[in-house]
């Protein structure tokens, strides 16, 4: 383990029996107040392009937990990648009564989507989000399934992310003002704020709030970043 106490770049050399190794190590200033905007359930031709436009206008990168794209929407996923966002997986499908039948079925649901993304875009995805989150109760028709999956998922090569800021854009939020208020009052300085939003079809509540949320965050000292495999994972308490 190598740690750095000062910001800067140094070069580390190592010598073996047959080879000499070199590694450039960069230590960056730690960012304390981070917002990770995440979008579930896309892509679709109505909402996703509008989200991408708003992010581009504000020079913000985000994370998209996608379902299997329709063939006509393959270009939207490509745009997500091309514009520097993190492509992540929500699953090949989202039907609770299917994906949580067993560990094997859930793993197949992720593997199938990852293989599709790799074949189509050359991107090997490792970030995932459970339909309903790891704290879901919709899987209780199969007692203990979430406990078993969350225990094993890292061994399958996946990192899973829940959220600690809920926009409620898919349920209790009645309008864009509600979404804005839910997000901005949920942000906490000194941590990584993982914000749950959705880019499903015609999510106008979220679209009406997104630009204002970004401007609020920047004004109040937050940095917007995409999730990566090295980001500290946010996990809920498992309820099944």
Regions found by a protein language model. Give the residues of each.
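Extracytoplasmic soluble-region selector
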Residues: 1-30
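Short acidic, S/G/P-rich loop/turn micro-motifs used as interaction or catalytic elements
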Residues: 8, 44, 202
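Active-site beta->alpha N-cap acidic-glycine motif
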Residues: 26-124, 216, 232
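Catalytic domains of cell-wall/extracellular-matrix polysaccharide-remodeling enzymes
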Residues: 72, 94-196, 200-223, 229-230, ...
């Amino acid at each position: 383990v190598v740690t750095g106490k000062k910001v800067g770049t140094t070069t580390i050399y190592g010598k073996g029996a047959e080879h000499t190794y070199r590694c450039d190590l960069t230590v960056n200033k730690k960012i304390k107040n981070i917002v990770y905007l995440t979008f579930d359930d896309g892509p679709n031709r109505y909402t996703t392009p509008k989200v991408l436009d708003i992010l581009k206008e504000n020079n913000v990168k985000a994370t998209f937990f996608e379902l299997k794209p329709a063939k006509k929407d393959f270009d939207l996923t490509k745009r997500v990648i091309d514009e520097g966002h993190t492509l992540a997986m929500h699953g090949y499908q989202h039907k609770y009564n299917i994906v949580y039948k067993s560990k094997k079925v859930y793993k197949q649901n992720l593997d199938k989507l990852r293989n599709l993304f790799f074949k189509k875009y050359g991107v090997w995805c490792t970030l995932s989000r459970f339909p309903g989150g790891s704290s879901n109760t919709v899987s209780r028709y199969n007692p203990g399934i979430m406990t078993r999956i969350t225990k094993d998922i890292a061994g399958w090569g996946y990192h899973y992310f829940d959220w600690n800021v809920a926009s409620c854009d898919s349920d209790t939020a009645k309008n864009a003002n509600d979404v804005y208020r839910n997000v901005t009052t949920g942000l906490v300085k000194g941590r990584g704020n993982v914000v749950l939003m959705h880019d499903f079809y015609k999510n106008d509540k979220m679209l009406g709030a997104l630009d204002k949320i970004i401007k609020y965050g920047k004004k109040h000292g937050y940095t917007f970043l995409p999730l990566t495999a090295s980001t500290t994972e946010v996990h809920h308490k498992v309820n099944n």
